[in-house]
Each structure stands twice: as C-alpha cells, then as structure tokens.
C-alpha cells in the first residue's frame, strides 16, 4: 500500500528532515515514478506554452476584461501543474505534506478561473455572474479548508471539485453565457474525463495508477484550455 494521509501528516509533525520514501512504504516502483515524472514534465511544458499563447493572444486582440480573465486562468493552470508535480514527486517528508495543501488549493483556483473566462463577456447575464461569484466563494472556502484542515475533508473535496466542474451545465441551461457549442462540448469532455477517471484515483492496487490518473487529468485540462482559448478568440473577433 502507498503511504496514507495519516502517515504523511505524522511525518509533518516529526520534524523538517526528509526520509527515504520507502521507509514508510511509499512503494511506487521506479517505472511508475518515471512514468509519473514524464507526465508531469509534459504537463508543465504544455502549461507554459498554453498560458503563454493565451496571454499573448489576449493581450494583442482581446478586451481588457478578457485579458484579466486569461491571466487569472493562466495562474490557475500553472498553479495546478506546478504544485501537482512538486507534491507527487517530492520525497515523503514534512515538505510534501505542505505541498499537498497547495496542490489541493490550486484545483479550486483553476476551476473557478476556468469559468471566469466564460462569464466576463459583456453579454453574460445576472444568473451567470451569480454562479461565478458562488464558484469563487466555494473556491475560497475550499482553499481555506485545504490549508487549515489538511487531509480531513478529502472525500468531500472530491465531490466539491466535481460539482464545481459540472456547473457548466447551469451556465449552458440559463442561456446567459455566449458559450459556443464547440467550447461547451470541450468542457463536457473535460468533465467526463475527470469524472470517469476518478476510478483510477482510488484504484490503488492498479500498476501505474498514479500516472494514469494524472494523464487523465492532463487530458481534461487540455480540453478545458481549448475551450477557454476558443472563447477568448471568438470574443476578440467580435
């Protein structure tokens, strides 16, 4: 079995030194670790290129509010990819436990930031704006919980992540967001990937489980990025 949440928390209370991950049965094989490393390297490269491209395009062609939204989204994107890599690849020690808090917090930031890119358009209605405000409030509470109560609300957090992600259905149903159908399909594809991929997140006995889960998440992020890019592009040309 992998190191549990309680084991990592106990190490965080013992002192600042890092120990061999194998000492507490963090038994990912070398091949599994390399696979996870490769996926995170690809993810970081993708994030840097994607964020850079989005920001350059927004700065050259989009209105001010869209530039702000693109900047917030890029911050969320890079935060998720960076903290995921740092947390998952760091040796088991107190530092890893702290990185775990930021890893979980970054997910809330990215979800709220993603929908910000769709609602800043001047055509967005009151309901859509209220949904966005609600998402940011939930994100703020989630970040506070992840930082102050690490490891105690993990199952609830997963449900909150999924619920926030599928809030796109609300935005689409109220018809108050000028969301192109292609962008909507990309968001649905991303949500479906993460939701279905949760089986890999909890299937700890599966070899390469961690790498497979992170690959699924990366594919979902790519779908959501494509949706954001398409919306920013369409708004820049209107």
Where are these regions (language model features)?
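Multi-pass alpha-helical transmembrane bundles in non-GPCR membrane proteins
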Residues: 1-238
């Amino acid at each position: 079995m992998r190191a549990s949440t309680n084991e990592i928390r106990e190490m965080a209370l013992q002192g600042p030194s890092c120990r061999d991950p194998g000492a507490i049965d963090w038994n990912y094989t070398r091949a599994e670790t390399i696979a996870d490393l490769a996926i995170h390297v690809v993810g970081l490269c993708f994030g840097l290129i994607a964020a850079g491209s989005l920001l350059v395009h927004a700065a050259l062609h989009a209105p001010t509010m869209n530039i702000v939204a693109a900047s917030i989204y890029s911050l969320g994107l890079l935060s998720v990819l960076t903290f995921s890599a740092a947390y998952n690849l760091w040796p088991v020690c107190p530092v890893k436990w702290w990185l775990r808090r930021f890893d979980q917090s970054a997910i809330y930031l990215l979800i709220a930031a993603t929908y910000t890119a769709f609602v800043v358009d001047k055509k967005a209605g009151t309901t859509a704006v209220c949904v966005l405000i609600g998402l940011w409030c939930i994100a703020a509470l989630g970040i506070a919980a992840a930082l102050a109560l690490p490891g105690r609300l993990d199952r609830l957090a997963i449900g909150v992540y999924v619920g926030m992600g599928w809030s796109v259905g609300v935005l689409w149903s109220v018809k108050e967001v000028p969301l192109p159908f292609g962008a909507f399909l990309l968001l649905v594809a991303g949500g479906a990937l993460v939701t279905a991929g949760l089986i890999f997140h909890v299937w700890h006995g599966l070899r390469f489980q961690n790498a497979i889960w992170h690959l699924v998440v990366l594919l979902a992020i790519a779908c959501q990025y494509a949706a954001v890019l398409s919306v920013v592009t369409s708004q820049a040309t209107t």
